[in-house]
């Protein structure tokens, strides 16, 4: 493809604002020609942010039918339970897809999505934006370069305090729409970071969950242990009820030759035998800008996406297995 990509944004609330910023940053490659949402207020806000005169729709099926070849790709930023239906319709219409996390809310949907994408011959990219953070990319480079030798243990964390009124009356508090609790939401980020750095398939998963603060069906805090087929032990800690001293998310890798700790654009490397780690300040990055740029390049240059539907399924499988192993956590913590 040698032209500018014509994109439709399906879902114009919340996180779509960050996606829109990425579109504006890379207007030389991609432009938003249509918006779809059931909320007129959301449509108005996003149209104002993007500028121009994108077509507005209340129904994505109608949008896909009426716009036809006027759309090359879609960016899906809907509530979780609507991801799969929108993906199926966009794939059937032959549109390339960027979809927010999670890809869907169960493995049956995930398997059907993998098949639908292959059948349509389109590019599907999972919106794993935190893989574009400087610390994640540098840690991956160091692991692959042997800086810590054989990796033994990886911890991936994403935690912050969400006000206890934030979920009141929201779809995220409802298991039917959310597909789970915090782990399938914010916790999705540290899960895909762990999978990316471990570089192997999952052998076993065990989860522990709790709900300490928020009025919701699912958990607001989760701890997950993962064993990989290459022997790496992984840990995920994610929560909406406590802060971290190093920012909202961080990574810690221990190998036979040393350790790496990273958060945001800061990196610390402690080889075996040293008492003081070396410190490296990495270049700042906007992961949503980089994500949109990557998606556009995949379409324009015919490149495979760095994280497609298979990766989306693998992340979801860890989350669902953790939830299954933690079944009964509400009763165990006295929460009903």
Question: Which positions does each model-derived feature cover?
Answer:
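C-terminal helix-rich "cap/oligomerization" subdomain common to oxidoreductases
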Residues: 1, 73-75, 229, 297-336
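Beta-loop-alpha module in the N-terminal Rossmann-like domain of NAD(P)-dependent dehydrogenases
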Residues: 19, 54-116
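Predominantly a Rossmann-like dinucleotide-binding segment in NAD(P)-dependent oxidoreductases
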Residues: 130-215, 329
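Contiguous beta-strand/loop segments that form the cofactor/metal-binding neighborhood of enzyme cores
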Residues: 1, 191-266, 289-303, 322
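Hydrophobic residues in well-ordered beta-strands that form the structural core
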Residues: 99, 105, 124-126, 236, ...
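N-terminal Rossmann-like dinucleotide-binding module
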Residues: 1-51
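Rossmann-fold dehydrogenase core element
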Residues: 112-129, 149-154
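Active-site loop of classical SDR/Rossmann-like NAD(P)-dependent oxidoreductases
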Residues: 38, 281-293
């Amino acid at each position: 493809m040698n032209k500018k990509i014509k994109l439709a944004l399906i879902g114009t609330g919340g996180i779509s604002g960050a996606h829109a910023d990425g579109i504006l940053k890379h207007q030389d490659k991609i432009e938003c020609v249509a918006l779809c949402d059931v909320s007129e207020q959301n449509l108005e806000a996003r149209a104002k942010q993007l500028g121009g005169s994108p077509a507005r729709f209340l129904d994505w099926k109608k949008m896909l039918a009426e716009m036809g070849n006027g759309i090359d790709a879609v960016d899906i930023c809907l509530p979780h339970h609507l991801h799969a239906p929108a993906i199926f319709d966009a794939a059937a219409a032959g549109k390339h897809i960027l979809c927010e996390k999670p890809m869907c809310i169960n493995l049956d949907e995930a398997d059907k999505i993998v098949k639908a994408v292959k059948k349509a011959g389109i590019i599907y990219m999972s919106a794993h934006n935190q893989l574009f953070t400087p610390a994640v990319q540098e840690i991956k480079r160091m692991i692959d370069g042997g800086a810590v030798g054989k990796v033994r243990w990886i911890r991936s964390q994403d935690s912050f305090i969400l006000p206890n009124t934030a979920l009141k009356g929201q779809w995220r508090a409802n298991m039917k729409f959310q597909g789970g609790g915090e782990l399938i939401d914010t916790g999705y980020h540290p899960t895909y970071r762990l999978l990316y750095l471990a570089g192997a398939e999952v052998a076993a998963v065990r989860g522990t969950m709790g709900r300490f603060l928020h009025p919701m069906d699912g958990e607001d805090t989760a701890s997950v242990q993962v064993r990989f087929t290459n022997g790496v032990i992984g840990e995920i800690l994610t929560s909406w009820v406590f802060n971290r001293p190093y920012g909202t998310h961080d990574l810690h890798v221990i190998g036979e030759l040393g350790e790496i700790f990273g958060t945001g654009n800061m990196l610390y490397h402690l080889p075996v035998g040293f008492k003081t780690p070396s410190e490296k300040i990495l270049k700042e990055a906007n992961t949503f800008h980089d994500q949109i740029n990557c998606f556009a390049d995949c379409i324009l240059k015919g490149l495979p996406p760095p994280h497609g539907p298979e990766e989306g399924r693998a992340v979801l499988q860890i989350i669902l297995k953790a939830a299954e192993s933690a079944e009964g956590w509400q009763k165990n913590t006295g929460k009903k």
